[in-house]
Amino acid sequence: MTARQSYHLTFARFSPSLSVRSFSASEAVNTAYRVEITATSTDSSLPLSSYLNQRAAFEIRPQEGLLSEVVGVFGSASDDPPAKQWQGIITSCEKLSVSKDETVYRFVLEPRFAALKHFQSSRLFQNQTVPDIVAAVFKHHGFSGVDYRFQKSRSYTVREYVTQYLESDFDFVNRLCEEEGIWYAFEQHEQHGDVVVFGDSPEHYFRDPSLPVSYRPHAGLESVGTEALFNLSIRHNPVVEGIRSADYNYRTADTDLFAETDNKQSEESADNTVLLGKQQHWGLHPKTPNEAEVQTTLLNEAVLCRQTVANGSGNVVSMAPMKVFQTDVSFPEASDGWLVLSMEHSGSRDTAYSHTFTAIPAQLAFRPERTTPRPHIAGTLPARVTAAENCTYAYIDDMGRYRVKLPFDLDEWSPSGESRPVRLAKPYAGPEYGIHFPLHEGTEVMLSFVQGNPDRPYISGVMHDSAHTDHIPADWNTRNVIRTWANNKLRMEDIKRLTG
């Protein structure tokens, strides 16, 4: 890239007369990038509300002239491909100031995926893998098969029951990806625009032949006109000795779901000095020992991949999150190069393009940190027992479990397919004995949740309501009555004159 660049903001449907004054961009793995563009125009009355949610692209190009201009619709800036580009939609427009000569505007460009932050949903997914669920969310929002893709190196567990509860679709996708160790980043395609790429292995990192880059420490302004890294510092962090996890699955109550990783080298290894204790996790919700091992390994890899972190600055335009770059100076910490995790970009009319970045050794398996909070249900939720078609009696399975319909679930399911089998808490239980009065279709129940996890419901109580009235009216306040669905009765009277 030459010493000067031009910056272009193009719109799919509009061609305003604008000149880019400056821009800043922030992007990282497993989040949506955000590009803020400040531009000037002689037109003080641009219809900004019409620009919202419209397709747009911001480009960096080599500059021969003196001005950076917005030149209209897609592709009109130049027939040559841009040195760098972000595509997406306009999510914010502002008029910052108005003077006699010009008006200053600010536009925010984000990928289409970012729009899912504004869709809050509560719904159920059953018997699907996480990639299947993510694909279903994308399809629900009109994304086609070319707008996202999965690059998988392992098979994924079919999840019996996944609940999205008062959670944005964006957060929901992020949370599931974090739980399964899936990363995502964006590619920019001339035909398809911004494309979300999901991956789970180093073999899926983006490798660009143009990214053997020059390392010129303290070069600063003397390297203007030449792409290089100006600074690269390497931080070594302590890591835990290992990860331990445990859980309980009532379906296979005797199965041990304990799993553990050990990051110790040999007893004499100097690397042991960086180890700090162990992390213990309970409630990751694995169903089998293999699932417990996978979850523990993913948590351990999330720790190990951050043991060595590089921070740097430069002006290499082609660098982007999940791209691997090599330097002309070797670093023993990164024999296979560096994997970019996050970047901050900036440029203006008066200053050339530059960026800062963080990276990790590319030979490591990157796992996103589990930062997206899981929805938590502290109390109870009402639900109704459901049954299969033409079911005369209570619809229960061999473990005495029920199917229920939750009030927030607006999707259509086949009869009795509204939920996973849900256990009923009882006042007395043991091996083939206890107290259990079967619940019939339509009965209102109260659901509680193990550790507040919406994916782990159980019936904690049964309720009467206006459609299913209590069999003890007000004037029977001395009677204790057990009455079954078929009108079998056991009545005990507590009036003092009738009791001993």
Model segments located where?
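Amphipathic alpha-helical and helix-coil boundary elements used as assembly
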Residues: 1-500
